[in-house]
Amino acid sequence: MVDNLAPLEPSLQNLVDQESLKWIFVGGKGGVGKTTCSSSLAVQLAKVRESVLIISTDPAHNISDAFDQKFTKVPTKVNGFNNLFAMEIDPNAGLSELPEEYFDGENEALRVSKGVMQEMINALPGIDEAMSYAEVMKLVKGMNFSVVVFDTAPTGHTLRLIAFPQVVEKGLGKLLRLKMKLAPLLTQFVAMLGMADVNADTLSQKLDDMLRVITQVNEQFKNPDQTTFVCVCIAEFFSLYETERLVQELTKCGIDVHNIIVNQLLFLEKSHNSCSMCASRFKIQEKYLDQIADLYEDFHVTKLPLLEKEVRGPESIKAFSENLMIPFNPKETSNK
């Protein structure tokens, strides 16, 4: 019966057309071109959305290199665009990665310094990273971008990032349930640090606010109308293996995934007198492309070319991004 179904469109047009999407993750094995693909997708989304944010959660922070522009932990407009913004965060860096102003309240009584918050959570292993993520999600959500694209770290870190909303929601929930027992201790602790204007209620309110945002984000991440994941791979064994592992883990987490990008492909004509290495490489890729077609027949599989030059700078990304929408045709390229 499957053979009678028309193959799905080999592009990311379906994602650009899906106006309900709020969160798009792009990930895969290291070195497959995730940043180029996520940046290109963000450029295409900027054509049809009011405002787009691309966030790098990879400590390597390659989007600065991709757009040839330095980005920080504060959303910055990308050169050459009116509605595309970029920021780089390192979830592993914890609360130290966040600017001081993210810890400010509307009045003096609600202000909690980063140092105090850091001291209080240092005794809880892993909570620093989780709190950092929670604050970032709270920040991003408050900015009301039409859609957010995550340029993620290699697979292992990505799976941890995806699971964070659930982890944080459970962790903050436990902390809040203990707040009545901890309140006297917390009050004494901040008093010892000379922070008279900070009390347990202030910290509790911070946690309440965070929990509310994270609960909402957790619900959205599991809603295919609002969240999806794009897997990027190359036509090689280890990359395909990582992709299958990633797809299975995402499915377990309840995250929608129905788009795969196969990057760095050689497009050779049969009559083309190519070098022996190119011909061998082409045969290897053909083998794994056949496996991808069998494994992911119900996915949109987009094939991208291996280029002679690197994709760097806004104009270069704009040009390359067209390959996400229109299947690459080597004949058209050679005629230009």
Curated annotation (Swiss-Prot):
Source species, domain of life: Eukaryota
EC number from the UniProt entry: 3.6.-.-
Binding site for ATP: K29, G30, G31, V32, G33, K34, T35, T36, E236, N263
Entries under InterPro entries matching the protein: Anion-transp_ATPase-like_dom, ATPase_ArsA/GET3, ATPase_ArsA/GET3_euk, P-loop_NTPase
Subcellular localization: Cytoplasm; Endoplasmic reticulum
Keyword Secreted: no
Alphabetical keyword list: ATP-binding, Cytoplasm, Endoplasmic reticulum, Hydrolase, Metal-binding, Nucleotide-binding, Transport, Zinc
General function of this protein: ATPase required for the post-translational delivery of tail-anchored (TA) proteins to the endoplasmic reticulum. Recognizes and selectively binds the transmembrane domain of TA proteins in the cytosol. This complex then targets to the endoplasmic reticulum by membrane-bound receptors, where the tail-anchored protein is released for insertion. This process is regulated by ATP binding and hydrolysis. ATP binding drives the homodimer towards the closed dimer state, facilitating recognition of newly synthesized TA membrane proteins. ATP hydrolysis is required for insertion.
Name used for this protein in its record: ATPase ASNA1 homolog
Organism: Drosophila grimshawi
